[in-house]
Amino acid sequence: MKKLLIYIAAFAMILAMNTSCEDMGSLEEHPKKVDATTFMANAKEVESVINSIYFQLRRDPGFSRYLIVLEEGLADYCIGRGNYATAYDTGLTSGGVGFSKDSWAVLYRAIRFANNILDGIGNTPLSQQEYNNLTGETRFLRAFAYSWLARNWGAVPFFDEQNMNDFNKPRTPEADIWKFVIDEADYAASNLPEVAKAAGRPSRYAALALKTEACLYAGRYEEAAEAAGLIISSKRYSLVEVGKADDFLDLYGHTANATSEEIFYIKFNRDSGSTIAYMYLCKPNPFVNMGAVGIYTDYQKNKFIQNWDQNDLRYQFGLYKQTQNGTLNALTK
């Protein structure tokens, strides 16, 4: 069980074998470059374009559903169902490609918005602090998107504001992608505020957290420890105290917000259209009847669940049991 933060999203499978729930089509959207002479005329207008990056990340193929299921379906504690089962079994069936290509697309769309902003922001009349904060946030989000591309696909095509109109580019080596993410995180950490200007937006410490993770992927362990140490020494964050299973509601519950553990997060609720909850149920079940929903775990057959210490508070909080066709299943909350 993981927290609904930047590392968790939920996914659904109400679709045909070769299509995904939200039809992303292709990347051929006939995009129009932002004209800084008619738009991005001030800091608020730049922020409105930055919000478009967040919108891409929050779409169904992003962190609302598909993106993480490709990883969750591979976890020892989960079993994929329907098209999500193919991500575990083969990875590249027609159904599996439908999900992964859409996740790929939203990440590159987020990058495209970031590149457009960085290409045009030099024409916007801004104070030095506004420029630093806005470019820091934009470059953080672009690096964040590249980090998810690299962790899922390794070497990927690379586009920035200098070459964003080049097409049919070959893949850039994975090591170069991680170097870019680390360099961008350094810039963001130097230009973002100590305290995020709004909930859900990045701060200096979000950039340091991104650098920490990127350095681990890149095998730059001393730099990872140094960046993490700066977060720890700030004393701005701490673990939520848990003494009984229900205390996890203080961290994962629907009323939890801006807890002491949260550095950067993308959150969803019932009204936002996210389907995270039902993606962790199997069908049929007494809670929701909505297709052959996504991932769950089998209590009797899954060795990870069988061997999990039932005195572990995470076990007590994160699993509940349901009978399906005479088989007892444990489902993540």
Identify the function of each model-found stretch.
Residues 1-8:
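Bacterial N-terminal signal peptides that target proteins for export
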Residues 4, 21-70, 306:
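Acidic, glycine-rich segments characteristic of secretory precursors and extracytoplasmic regions
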Residues 14-18, 146:
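Bacterial Sec-type N-terminal signal peptides, specifically the leucine/valine-rich hydrophobic h-region
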Residues 31-34, 92-95, 160-167, 244-245:
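Short linear capping/connector segments at secondary-structure termini
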Residues 42-43, 47-51, 55-61, 83-153, ...:
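Conserved, well-structured interaction surfaces
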Residues 85, 89, 98-102, 233, ...:
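Elongated scaffold/linker segments in the mid-to-C-terminal portions of large proteins
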